[in-house]
UniProtKB/Swiss-Prot annotation:
Binds to the 23S rRNA. It holds the Pfam family Ribosomal_L27A. InterPro entries: Ribosomal_uL15, Ribosomal_uL15/eL18, Ribosomal_uL15/eL18_sf, Ribosomal_uL15_bac-type. The gene is rplO. Residues 21-31 have a biased composition (Gly residues). This is Large ribosomal subunit protein uL15. Keywords: Ribonucleoprotein, Ribosomal protein, RNA-binding, rRNA-binding.
Length: 143
């Protein structure tokens, strides 16, 4: 058996119904569209979200909130990640080269999540109060 020779079982596939090809077919003349009206015409149907002139739901509800674009340039790094990284000195460039933060990232903050078991010297990176205490307890420093 070859993949290109596999065929469906006889009678398993039905031919597509061809509409508008004479009254003997059962779907001639109006082709299943009924008589008159917008939906019977070519190109005749409302746009998505149109409610017949009633104020649409999307406009009835109030605007709310926004997505800060500055978040695209910020990133967080955990203590566990720093521990796995294996570098003695860490800055934003080192994190980018290690692939821990994206290329567009400008601001990095270390958060206290997990544990740090070795000394790490941070420079040009923000830290939370808990993370700073954990880094200094492990013999590291924050510049």
């Amino acid at each position: 058996m070859q993949l290109n020779s596999i065929k469906p079982a006889a009678g398993a596939k039905h031919a597509k119904r061809r509409v508008g090809r004479g009254i003997g077919s059962g779907l001639g003349k109006t082709a299943g569209r009924g008589h008159k009206g917008q939906k019977s015409r070519a190109g005749g149907y409302h746009k998505v979200g149109f409610e017949g002139g009633q104020m649409p739901l999307q406009r009835r509800l109030p605007k709310r909130g926004f997505k800060s674009q500055s978040l695209r340039f910020n990133a967080e790094v955990t203590l566990t990640t720093l521990d796995r990284l294996g570098l003695a000195e860490v800055d934003v460039l080192a994190l980018k080269q290690a692939g821990l933060v994206g290329e567009l990232i400008k601001v990095v903050k270390v958060i206290k999540s997990g544990a740090l078991n070795r000394a790490v010297k941070l420079s040009g990176v923000g830290v939370t109060a808990g993370a700073k205490a954990a880094i200094e307890a492990a013999g590291g420093s924050v510049a």
